[in-house]
Amino acid sequence: MGIEEKLPSGFLLTTVEGLAGYVRKGSLWPASFGLACCAIEMMATAGGRFDIARFGMEAFRASPRQADLMIVAGRVSQKMAPVLRQIYDQMVEPKWVLAMGVCASSGGMFNNYAIVQGVDHIVPVDIYLPGCPPRPEMLLNAILTLHEKIQQMPLGVHRDEVARAAEQAALAATPTIQMKGLLR
């Protein structure tokens, strides 16, 4: 389909990878997965004061098939976890996940059976954004950090290897139910 399929493995010039990373980072299409108060701050980021359109993200996509960045904003319940994974699986490659807020990152103050203690138990997370709720400036900083990470991503079969290894490492976390004495 693209240049990464046409060229043999290992035969990519650094400038081509750099150019592809530059283009890719400037055209992220986010899918918002707003579940709590963090979603309000995410919507404020799209407003005129903070202007997320400067980074090529002016339209939040309603369909995961059109998005390559998922911003999980807020707490995820156990019933919502399969839906989150299904949306992640429907996104186009390459795809990235940003966990926005303490609830998405670690469950927040909701340490009970109904809330997933961090979305990294469901999908691999690329950037963790702390705060309750994080301000739009922090979200923009996290997006710029993600831009730097995207710029360094390789092309071709190497990209698939890196993505597969990152997903395996991210989902290898110990479930919090197995962590004894967490709040004692």
Curated annotation (Swiss-Prot):
Domain of life: Bacteria
Cofactor binding, note field: Binds 1 [4Fe-4S] cluster.
EC number: 7.1.1.-
UniProt KW keywords: 4Fe-4S, Cell membrane, Iron, Iron-sulfur, Membrane, Metal-binding, NAD, Quinone, Translocase, Transport
PROSITE patterns assigned: COMPLEX1_20K
Keyword ATP-binding in record: no
Record GO biological process: aerobic respiration; electron transport coupled proton transport
Compartments (UniProt record): Cell membrane
Cited InterPro entries: NADH_UbQ_OxRdtase-like_20kDa (IPR006137), NADH_UQ_OxRdtase_20Kd_su (IPR006138)
GO annotation, cellular component aspect: plasma membrane; respiratory chain complex I
Membrane topology: Peripheral membrane protein
Cofactors (names): [4Fe-4S] cluster
Catalytic activity: a quinone + NADH + 5 H(+)(in) = a quinol + NAD(+) + 4 H(+)(out)
GO molecular function, one term: NADH:ubiquinone reductase (non-electrogenic) activity
Quaternary structure annotation from Swiss-Prot or TrEMBL: NDH-1 is composed of 14 different subunits. Subunits NuoB, C, D, E, F, and G constitute the peripheral sector of the complex.
Described function: NDH-1 shuttles electrons from NADH, via FMN and iron-sulfur (Fe-S) centers, to quinones in the respiratory chain. The immediate electron acceptor for the enzyme in this species is believed to be a menaquinone. Couples the redox reaction to proton translocation (for every two electrons transferred, four hydrogen ions are translocated across the cytoplasmic membrane), and thus conserves the redox energy in a proton gradient.
HAMAP family per the UniProt record, alphabetical: NDH1_NuoB (MF_01356)
Protein name, as recorded: NADH-quinone oxidoreductase subunit B
Primary gene name: nuoB
